[in-house]
Structures are given as structure tokens and as C-alpha cells.
Design a protein with these regions (language model features):
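Short beta-strand segments
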Residues: 12-46, 63
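Covalent nucleotidyltransferase core used to form phosphodiester bonds in nucleic acids
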Residues: 5-7, 42-55
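Extracellular/periplasmic catalytic domains that process cell-envelope and extracellular macromolecules
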Residues: 8, 35, 100-101
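Short, solvent-exposed coil/turn segments
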Residues: 10-12, 27, 58, 102
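Short, structured beta-strand-loop surface elements
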Residues: 48-123
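Portal/gating segments that form or line small-molecule/metal binding sites
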Residues: 24, 73, 124-128
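Extreme N-terminal tail/first-helix region
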Residues: 1-16, 119, 125-129
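Generic signal for short, ordered secondary-structure residues
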Residues: 3-4, 36, 74, 88
Length: 129
């Protein structure tokens, strides 16, 4: 990441995920728990595929994230229980340690390297959120 590491926000309790509404095309923001592993963020959809934000990600994986002092453009990927079994179990364990909860459908958020910036240096850009 430019300007630092996602590990610096690992202790934050929530992040703000913005997806593109699959029907309206409008930005949709949610507050959600997360964990960090290997410079990626992992979120858990409690209601699995029924979660609107997961449906939005399935339609358009381009997302934005605000966490701590960071604003990050990223790509989201819903993990597959079969092909991503080991990763699924690892991030669920990290979430269990952080929140005492790690159920739900994990979604991996991978920052777009050139677009990850520290909010202090892009304060004007936050008005677009």
C-alpha cells in the first residue's frame, strides 16, 4: 500500500464499505466488522448471499473502504467454501479472536495499490463519499 500498511488499522473495530447498488448504480455504504490478513481485509456477511452488499459485490466487485485514517479503492471477492476452505477457516479464526464471532460468508477486499491513500493527504476527496 502507498503510505503504509493495512496492519496499522487492524485494531479498528469497524470499517465503512461502499458498494455500487446493483439496481440503482448509486453508492451504498455499510458499517461492518473486519479483520486484516496479509494486506487484505476480510468482512463477514452474517446473512450470507442474502446480504444486499454481497449481492452488490457479486454484480460489481469495485468497492471503496474507509477505515481509521485510510480511504481505499479495492476489489471485493466472495470466498468459496470449497476452493477457499483454508483461507476461510483462517480468517474466521482471526475474527473469532477479535470479536468472538467469525460466522457468516467471508468477503475478501484487496486494495488497488495505486489508489490506497491516507485520508490526511486527501481530505477533499472524502466529500465525494
Amino acid at each position: 500500500m502507498a503510505c503504509g500498511s493495512l496492519e496499522s488499522v487492524a485494531d479498528e473495530q469497524v470499517l465503512y464499505l461502499t458498494t455500487v447498488g446493483r439496481r440503482t448504480g448509486l453508492p451504498r455504504e455499510i458499517e461492518i466488522w473486519f479483520v486484516v490478513r496479509c494486506e487484505r481485509l476480510y468482512l463477514f456477511a452474517e446473512t450470507g448471499e442474502a446480504a444486499n452488499w454481497v449481492k452488490n459485490v457479486r454484480r460489481n466487485p469495485k468497492v471503496s473502504v474507509r477505515v481509521g485514517d485510510w480511504r481505499i479503492d479495492a476489489t471485493a471477492r466472495v470466498l468459496d467454501r470449497q476452493s477457499d476452505r483454508k483461507l476461510w477457516d483462517q480468517v474466521a479464526e482471526i475474527a473469532n479472536r477479535k470479536y468472538r464471532w467469525g460466522d457468516g460468508l467471508p468477503v475478501e477486499i484487496t486494495p488497488v495499490p495505486s489508489r490506497a491513500t491516507h485520508c490526511d493527504s486527501i481530505q477533499a476527496g472524502l466529500d465525494d463519499f
